[in-house]
Each structure stands twice: as C-alpha cells, then as structure tokens.
Amino acid sequence: MHGFRALKSEVIMSNMTNAAPHTPIQEADYSAIHPPSLLKRLELTNPVFWLSGSFLSLFVLLALTNTESLTAMVNAGFGFATKYFGAYWQVLLLLNFLIGLALAFGRTGYVRLGGLAKPDIDTFKWLSIVLCTLLAGGGVFWAAAEPIAHFVTAPPLYGEASPKTSAINALSQSFMHWGFLAWAILGCLSSIVLMHLHYDKGLPLKPRTLLYPIFGDKAIHGWIGNLADACSIIAVAAGTIGPIGFLGLQISYALNSLFGFPDNFITQSMVIVAAIVMYTLSALSGVSKGIQLVSRYNIILSVLLIGYILFFGPTSFIIDGYVQGVGRMVDNFFPMALYRDDTGWLSWWTVFFWGWFIGYGPMMAIFIARISRGRTIRQLILSISIAAPLITCFWFSIVGGSGLAFELANPGLISSAFEGFNLPAVLLAITGELPFPMIISVLFLILTTTFIVTTGDSMTYTISVVMTGSAEPNAVIRSFWGLMMGVVAIALISMGSGGITALQSFIVITAVPVSFILLPSILKAPGIANQMAKDQGLV
C-alpha cells in the first residue's frame, strides 16, 4: 500500500511538472465566462437591499391601503423628530460649516484629495453637476414660492415691517434655508472623511464608512454598517421620490393652466414616465457622460433665463435685493442659525429644511467624493460651502425677487396665487409678468424637469454604488433603482398629493438616525485632514 501511494504521488507530481504553464483568468474574462446571476446583479443577497426595499414597499402599501394611519404615524414621527432633535440639528449644521471653513483656510486647505495630482473633471462641469444635483426641483418652485411665503407671513426673528423691508427680510430668510449651512452639510467634512478612507485606505464608498472612525471594522462588516447604509438609502430615496412625484403634480397643473391639458392622474403619470426615462438613461451612461451632459445644459438654460429676467425684469430690485438680502443674512447669521423661540414655525421651516438636507447628507457625500478626486480641501469647501450658496441666493433673487418686486408694485398679484401653498401657481404668476410669458413659462417647466432629472440620475447612480460597492455599478441595478423610484412616485400620486406629502415629511424622520451617521465626520475630520497634510508634507 505504501508503495502504491508513493507511485501515485510521483505520477501526480510528474503531471504537474509537465503540464502547460497556468495562466490566471483575469476578472473580466471570468465574468464573461461566468456572468453573475440576476439575483447577484440586483444585490438580492445583500441585507441592505432587503432592509431598504422592504421598508419602502411597506410605506407604499400603507399609503395605498390606509392613508389616514400612515399620515398619523408620519405626523407623530415628524413632530417627535423636530421637537427633540431640532436644536441638535441646528448645532450640527453650524459646527459642520465652521469647522469646514477652519480646515479650508488652514494649512489643511492645501491637502489634495482622492490620490490624484489634479482634478479628473474640469471645474465648470464639476460645479454644474454639484449645483444641479443639490438644488433639484427646489431650485425652481421653492425659489419662486419661499420668498413670497416669508413676505406674506413674516419670520418671527424679523417680525412685521414696511413692505420693502419685509421683502428683503423674506429674501434673507430664504437665503438662510438654501445657503451656507444647507450646502455645507451635503458634502464637505463627510466627503473629506470618505475620500480619505476610500481612496487612501481602501474602505468601501458607502455610508457605513463614515462610522469607521468610531466603530472600526464593526462598521464595515457588521450590522451597524448594514443599518447605516439602509437608513441612508431610505432617506435619499424618499427625498428623490418626493420631488419626482411633485414634478408630476406641478407640471400637470402648469400644463393645464397654460395649454388646457387635463390635470389628472394620466397627465401626471406621463410626466413622471418621461422623467424616469431621462434620468435612468443618464444614470446608465455614467458620471462622465449623461450626468455631466444634463447638468451642463441645465446650467446653460439657467444662465439664459437669468440674463433674460435681468434684462426684461425688475433689474434694480433683483440686484438690491440680492446684496441687501445676503448682507442681512450675514449680519443675522448666528441668531438665525440658532433661533429657538417659535418652535412651531421652526418645525415647518428651518428644522424641516435641516432635516431634509441631513437626510441627503451621506449619499450626497458619496456622490461628491466620486466626482471630486484631485481637488484640494480648500477648493472643495469654498466651492460647496460658499460659492454654490451665493449662486443659489442669486438664483432665488432672480426668481423669487422678481415675484416680490411684482407684489410690491401690484399688491395681491403674487400672494393671491400663493394661497393654499400653490408653488407652481406662484411661478406662473411671476413668468406671466415677463415679456413672452408663454415661452418663458415653458422654459421654466423644462428647467424644473431637468433639475429633477439631474437629481434622479445622480441618486440612482449613488444608490447603485452603495448597493454594489463599485464605482461603476452594473446596468441592471442602475435601471432597477431608477425605475423603482419612478414607479413608487406614480403609485403615491395615484391617491392624490397625500402620499407624496407624507413621504416628504418622512425624510425628516429619517434624518434622526442619519444625523448620527454624519456626526463622526465633524468629530474626526480635523484629525484626518491634519494627518493627510502630514502625509503630503504640508506640515
């Protein structure tokens, strides 16, 4: 027996020695020979998929079968979140902004992120993508409606004043909600932490990585990470589905007002289907093609409309309103940021917006980390925390400032359209006062759609990145999430605006866990930035 084993061993060794040299199969070749199953490509074995997908499915099911119960639960959760976490969110956003500025203006400002010597996307394209993605549909309808809302009902910090002063106060409060603090939480400190841990340390480009400085490997491989990813996906899906649904409702209303199209479920669904097709195709083509292209054309159309309104609109008031509004916001920056007296007003304005932006935070940080390689900390923070907010404020002055000027000249013209919080009616009332109102109104509707498309494609792409852990997720999962968000929006609007409104409020509830995902970035970003500065020989 022993001789047989020895002979067998000798034969095996001889065969191994004489065999042709082994050529390892490359990963791409292996994938071509053994393509992953649909189960794998959709990440159906991923617990994050089941956590996020099941929750969204349950939400839609409740919306369709028991709207009253869902609304009651969401309202209760909304009230709890704004009451007990509102002050925490206000401090969180303020600290995030101030620490970011300190890093930008210190030696750490020269730190180059992402392991590249220069940016891989040129500045105009990069800023276009950032602006269009973060503004979403709010960049048009809220720009028109929020200033008149604060004009009609004065913010409690300012109180009642003369009409002209009230108009500037209204712009100032709008600038606060869409300004420095809001933009900073969407991708400054959190993006710095993600870019270091992903590009320098090899950790996944996922929300769970933001918890790594606190929990270590447990955040990457344990249930904590799965929960962080799922909460972030639910929050951003809710924040994207809501605007998609409102796009259908608002464009349908506008088409009825302008052209007499029936304002019904069919028209609303057709608008959403068109948006689904556009943002899904854009997401499939990737960051370097579709997402850049849509963002670039979006910015070009915005600039053309800005030029038109500046030339034919209330130019003097727009410029004065912008300068005085920004000045008043800066002058009252800390009182506005930390205002806590009228909690009822806060819950529907400042704290609502802070919860909304926090809900987007981790996923936007991932998207910004993906497109910002090669930029310095100073470029990143000053572009997102300062330049982008000032551009946004100017856009609000163009659209909302025009509305205020028309209201001052003809009281009731814009405020009557706003009754019932009718956002598209305000926009149409403003464009109706400009030369060639029909053409300008249509262009604004196109702009609104492309704003939503840029958010839809970016978030479809980012959710797919989180699901797969790949910077270039497969087409199947991109298509799935793009279609899923649109289908959910259609399902919710089938029961009227109640389902979409509940979903919009729900994102504020999701901001409770998401705000704790963002907290480690505020605590750890300075140390990480200093370490990168040392590694790059800057200190």
UniProtKB/Swiss-Prot annotation:
Keywords: Amino-acid transport, Cell inner membrane, Cell membrane, Membrane, Stress response, Transmembrane, Transmembrane helix, Transport. InterPro entries: BCCT_transptr. GO terms for biological process: amino acid transport. GO terms for molecular function: transmembrane transporter activity. It is found in: Cell inner membrane. This is Glycine betaine transporter 2. The keyword Transmembrane helix applies. Its main location: membrane. Involved in the uptake of the osmoprotectant glycine betaine. Signal peptide: none annotated. It comes from the Bacteria. Induction: Induced by NaCl upshock. It comes from Vibrio parahaemolyticus serotype O3:K6 (strain RIMD 2210633). PANTHER family: HIGH-AFFINITY CHOLINE TRANSPORT PROTEIN, HIGH-AFFINITY CHOLINE TRANSPORT PROTEIN-RELATED. The chain crosses the membrane at residues 44-64, 85-105, 129-149, 175-195, 231-251, 265-285, 299-319, 348-368, 380-400, 426-446, 480-500, 503-523. One of its GO terms (cellular component) is plasma membrane. Belongs to the BCCT transporter (TC 2.A.15) family. It is a multi-pass membrane protein.
